[in-house]
Amino acid sequence: MLEILYQDEWLVAVNKPSGWLVHRSWLDRDEKVVVMQTVRDQIGQHVFTAHRLDRPTSGVLLMGLSSEAGRLLAQQFEQHQIQKRYHAIVRGWLMEEAVLDYPLVEELDKIADKFAREDKGPQPAVTHYRGLATVEMPVATGRYPTTRYGLVELEPKTGRKHQLRRHLAHLRHPIIGDSKHGDLRQNRSGAEHFGLQRLMLHASQLSLTHPFTGEPLTIHAGLDDTWMQALSQFGWRGLLPENERVEFSAPSGQDGEISS
């Protein structure tokens, strides 16, 4: 069962778990766990995608309950009328607030994108980022005696493939758990010492104008246990009040206070 964050007669939003595909492609024909099919079975209605989240990313996934609803939502995404907010745990101390305007060359998959043009130049890519908190943990990683992490809020203003992951890697603050653009030593250390066994990138919030009612709509997605455990271990509880789960209890030996 997927957590349904919002549903009306036109739209449905779920909290996509890390590791789930949004829908099958011919490359993933045998995949058993797929968001679209699970939601369809769960609510007894066909759903229509309007945007995507990478497989390792968790958080708000918004779909239409008709082809028209899906089309109108997709149009809003394409025209950048929907505000997306993400949170990430990154390597090092990223403390400033700034806008990164750094064009990206399209990443092509050798199989899935074999018919795509390879001669496209860099495409505009803009991300607003803001450091929320930092921590230094007494765990050696590589040649350093301690390990530093940062909690970052991200708002992509464009929608390039892997944009947030690539932009943070460009800033030399790759997201923990990013196997393609990240720091392998940091990924291993985070998994071994702090249970960061996934890409630490979460789609926390979507804000839009409802395509049928015209009313403002904001949808929040709660954090999973890996995220909640990280916030507890790093002393960051209470920094993401709209996404932290009040029912989470930290493992023994860690800060187990419940925030409200």
Curated annotation (Swiss-Prot):
The keyword Cell division does not apply. Disulfide bonds: none annotated. One of its GO terms (molecular function) is RNA binding. InterPro entries: PsdUridine_synth_cat_dom_sf, PsdUridine_synth_RluA-like_CS, PsdUridine_synth_RsuA/RluA, RluA_PseudoU_synthase. GO terms for cellular component: cytosol. The active site is at D54. Keywords: Isomerase, tRNA processing. It is an enzyme of class 5 (isomerase). Pfam families: PseudoU_synth_2. Its EC number is 5.4.99.26. It catalyses: uridine(65) in tRNA = pseudouridine(65) in tRNA. Gene3D superfamilies: Pseudouridine synthase. The keyword Transmembrane does not apply. GO terms for biological process: enzyme-directed rRNA pseudouridine synthesis; RNA modification; tRNA metabolic process; tRNA processing; tRNA pseudouridine synthesis. Belongs to the pseudouridine synthase RluA family. PANTHER family: MITOCHONDRIAL RNA PSEUDOURIDINE SYNTHASE (PTHR21600), TRNA PSEUDOURIDINE SYNTHASE C (PTHR21600:SF56). Responsible for synthesis of pseudouridine from uracil-65 in transfer RNAs. This is tRNA pseudouridine synthase C. It comes from Escherichia coli (strain K12). The lineage of its organism: Bacteria, Pseudomonadati, Pseudomonadota, Gammaproteobacteria, Enterobacterales. The gene is truC.
